[in-house]
């Protein structure tokens, strides 16, 4: 069975607080795996590390056998400062731990190319949007829908991440075909989560349970290999929880 996700010895510290302590886990293709723990145990922080929101204090994350997140070699970097000056790093480190010339060159090259990557561990580590493009999607513990958009448009916007339009296709007027295809796929996703009848309503007008399902549809719109659901049943009533459990299963 193919390994999709491997989390190796991940620790995440914020000052003196250890939010995640030496987490190791694997997810294989076709598996449903639950990360269980009480409130405040660090589940959301673990998801944030896996999806590139945080750079871990120690450990690494591999997705489809490729390392996508790993700690700074000193083990003392608590946070990535995306797109900022290397001085932001050296100010946090002792003089003997200042960034090497190789690291500075890598940062300058990234800035020159205006790459949407964060600088960490002398490599260009993918940001959350790049990790999503690699095939990993997630939902959030606190709902983060686009409030001013309809149910349909919330999913369509996410679908555009996979759009393959370019200058060549535009010149041949092929963009319209892709737009039609994506709109059809959005409708299929809304049917899958039982929201096709409210597709034209504003996302925030939906009951809480349906907003949760919309978040899942939006995540699925990116065509992920791996889908991370952060407490998907939080705040739901028993009926909504049962419906969601049946859907996930």
Regions inferred by a protein language model and the residue ranges of each:
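Glycine-rich phosphate-binding loops of nucleotide-dependent enzymes
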Residues: 2-249
């Amino acid at each position: 069975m193919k390994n999709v996700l491997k989390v190796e010895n991940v620790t995440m510290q914020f000052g003196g607080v250890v939010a995640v302590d030496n987490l190791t886990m694997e997810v294989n293709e076709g598996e449903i795996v639950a990360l269980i723990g009480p409130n405040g145990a660090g589940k959301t922080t673990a998801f944030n590390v896996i999806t590139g929101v945080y750079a871990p204090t120690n450990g690494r994350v591999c997705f489809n056998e490729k390392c996508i997140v790993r700690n700074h070699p000193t083990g003392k970097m608590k946070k990535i400062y995306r797109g900022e000056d290397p001085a932001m790093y050296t100010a946090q480190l002792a003089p003997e731990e200042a960034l090497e010339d190789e690291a500075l060159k890598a940062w300058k090259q990234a800035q020159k190319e205006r790459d949407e990557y964060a600088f960490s561990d002398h490599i260009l580590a993918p940001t959350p949007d790049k990790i999503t493009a690699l095939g990993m999607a997630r939902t959030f513990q606190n709902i983060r829908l686009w409030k001013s958009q309809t149910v349909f448009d919330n999913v369509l916007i996410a679908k555009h991440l996979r759009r393959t339009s370019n200058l060549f296709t535009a010149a041949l007027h092929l963009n319209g075909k892709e737009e039609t295809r994506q709109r059809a796929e959005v409708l299929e996703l809304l049917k899958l989560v039982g929201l096709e009848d409210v597709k034209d309503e504003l996302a925030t007008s939906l009951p809480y349970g349906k907003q949760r399902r919309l978040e899942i549809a939006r995540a699925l719109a990116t065509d992920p290999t791996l889908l991370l659901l952060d407490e998907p049943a939080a705040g739901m009533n028993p009926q909504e929880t049962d419906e969601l459990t049946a859907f996930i299963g």
